[in-house]
């Protein structure tokens, strides 16, 4: 009998019952909640006269709808205000810990969970949010669920799931200078496509992945969803354990020692078999820039906007044509000649302290291009913001002409005051470049934080490996 993959180990450890239809009832170790997908779930509990099964297993934050300026004045948009106030009331009524809008620990749920130690290796982690896959970077089985499942998890501490197939994405060798975790995952998506991971749980491995920091691994796992996967994960190593050590929710004393002993088993066995293996050479990965309306529409910064007529597949050719029309681009245009209106550094993909340090290093001593309407930096949490300010990063950004904001999802999605106007073009460190994602008619290009910072200074894309040119 062959060994087990990391996914197998995590799955098997949480199966409560296997169902006749092939699904299984999985125990949930941690549920994370936010204001958008939880109101109906709490109302369902209320109508049924139920209470959460394990109150302490839940943690709530406000992130999607919160303003990133003038918080003392409250939320201007009535719908957003109601959603945030509803989460506040629900958490108070049901006794759930919440980091509300004015709490220093507030931030994007997928930044807050790991930094507070609420996400730990070996856990099942669920949230009513597709990018819950982020938490797999810590060797957890983490995936997004729907609102009805949020209610089910609150009431029973379980969810029903079908087991996914197993994919290993191995990135061999070392990354070159200026190439980041964001470039790795965009290159992976460019290789396998946004449907390449459909039906799979992806384990990311190889020398390049192991050399990434835990925050870098979070960036990779965050976008496993954009590759179509159910979840993404990285095996536990000493770096993982050191990351969790001492955080507020982390085990203490002898419980820590017991946890570490278990966590060290959370890796795929040498003889484990995967349903599919994809291999990339790290040395071939360059800084990436998306040009279209899907994360798979991506090329190296030194490349050009592709020509749909060179695509043999009719469906792909048609979608490329539509994307070019929406993005207002011509085939053959060098990526470096694409001029920008706005730059956004933030989101659950790239708003952690390492991301802000990388961006600040590029920005230091420069000024935002006069041609830009706005350059925005939004820390992923209050904790990240405090650390950045302690290091003086806020001054670097502000002196260069960036806006330094309060934490939240911000311009990643058009659910708050930070959004693009129709026709505006944005270099963004977020994870989705769909039509209208950042605002109706807005045009999004996905890049890493240093690339976004350099683009803000130049007013167009540049190769950060040769910065300043």
Swiss-Prot record:
It catalyses: (2R,3S)-3-isopropylmalate = (2S)-2-isopropylmalate. This is 3-isopropylmalate dehydratase large subunit. Catalyzes the isomerization between 2-isopropylmalate and 3-isopropylmalate, via the formation of 2-isopropylmaleate. Keywords: 4Fe-4S, Amino-acid biosynthesis, Branched-chain amino acid biosynthesis, Iron, Iron-sulfur, Leucine biosynthesis, Lyase, Metal-binding. GO terms for biological process: L-leucine biosynthetic process. It comes from the Bacteria. The gene is leuC. Binds 1 [4Fe-4S] cluster per subunit. Its EC number is 4.2.1.33. It comes from Alkalilimnicola ehrlichii (strain ATCC BAA-1101 / DSM 17681 / MLHE-1). GO terms for molecular function: 3-isopropylmalate dehydratase activity; 4 iron, 4 sulfur cluster binding; metal ion binding. Pathway: Amino-acid biosynthesis; L-leucine biosynthesis; L-leucine from 3-methyl-2-oxobutanoate: step 2/4.
């Amino acid at each position: 009998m062959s060994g087990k993959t990391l996914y197998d180990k995590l799955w098997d450890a949480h199966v409560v019952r296997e169902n006749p239809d092939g699904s299984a009832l999985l125990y949930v170790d941690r549920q994370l909640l936010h204001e958008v997908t939880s109101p109906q779930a709490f109302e369902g509990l209320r109508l049924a006269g139920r209470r959460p099964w394990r109150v302490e297993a839940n943690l709530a934050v406000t992130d999607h709808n919160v303003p990133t300026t003038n918080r003392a004045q409250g939320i201007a948009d009535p719908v957003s205000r109601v959603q945030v106030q509803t989460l506040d009331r629900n958490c108070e009524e049901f006794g759930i810990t919440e980091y509300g809008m004015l709490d220093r620990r507030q931030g994007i749920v997928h930044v807050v969970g790991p930094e507070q130690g609420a996400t730990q290796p070996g856990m099942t982690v669920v949230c009513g949010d597709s990018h819950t896959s982020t938490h797999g970077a810590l060797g957890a089985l983490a995936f997004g669920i729907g609102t009805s499942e949020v209610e089910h998890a609150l009431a029973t501490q379980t969810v029903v799931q079908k087991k996914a197939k197993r994919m290993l994405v191995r990135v061999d060798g070392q990354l070159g200078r200026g190439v980041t975790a964001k470039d790795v995952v965009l290159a992976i998506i460019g290789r396998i496509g946004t449907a390449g991971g459909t039906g799979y749980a992806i384990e990311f491995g190889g020398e390049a992945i192991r050399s990434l920091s835990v925050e870098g691994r979070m960036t990779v796992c965050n976008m496993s969803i954009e590759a179509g996967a159910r979840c993404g994960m990285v095996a536990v190593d000493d770096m993982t354990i050191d990351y969790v050590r001492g955080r507020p929710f982390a085990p203490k004393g002898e419980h820590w020692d017991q946890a570490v002993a278990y966590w060290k088993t959370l890796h795929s066995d040498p003889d484990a078999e995967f349903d599919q293996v994809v291999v990339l050479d790290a040395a071939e990965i360059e800084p990436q820039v998306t040009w279209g309306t899907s994360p798979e529409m991506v090329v190296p910064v030194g490349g050009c906007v592709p020509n749909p007529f060179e695509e043999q597949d009719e469906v792909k050719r048609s979608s490329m044509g539509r994307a070019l029309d929406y993005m207002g681009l011509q085939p053959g245009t060098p990526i470096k000649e694409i001029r920008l209106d706005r730059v956004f550094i933030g989101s659950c993909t790239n708003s952690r302290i390492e991301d802000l340090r990388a961006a600040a290093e590029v920005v230091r001593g420069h000024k935002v291009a006069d041609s830009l309407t706005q350059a925005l930096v939004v820390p992923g949490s209050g904790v990240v913001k405090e650390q950045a300010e302690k290091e003086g990063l806020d001054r670097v950004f502000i002196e260069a002409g960036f806006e330094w904001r309060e934490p939240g999802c911000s311009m990643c999605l058009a659910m708050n005051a930070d959004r693009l106007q129709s026709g505006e073009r944005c270099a963004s460190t977020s994870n989705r470049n769909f039509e209208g994602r950042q605002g109706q008619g807005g045009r999004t290009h996905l890049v890493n934080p240093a690339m976004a910072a350099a683009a803000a200074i130049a007013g167009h894309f540049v190769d950060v490996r040769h910065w300043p040119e």
